[in-house]
Amino acid sequence: MSLVSIIVPVYNVEPYIETCIQSLIRQTMGNIEVILVDDGSTDRSGELCDQYAEADERIRVIHKQNGGLSSARNAGISAAKGEYLLFVDSDDYVSASLVEKTV
């Protein structure tokens, strides 16, 4: 089964990021990596991402200076190991079968 890299740009989304991450780790397709790119958040977004990464080996966090959405996505692409890339915004809640149905 091919690895799917899910790239999530993160910037000051403390109220939403946990819901997003929880929806990603519940995916029915298990062969995923979640790359959270903290684009210089000034709230607790980056800290929350780190907590999830410590608890789940499928999650990686990249912390970088703020460079905007495209810069964050490009950082995620560079770090991705998957055959397929999936982009999710940090305020999204996705269905548990999103990756399985997409791939």
Give each language-model segment a name:
Residues 1-103:
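Nucleotide-sugar donor-binding/catalytic module of glycosyltransferases
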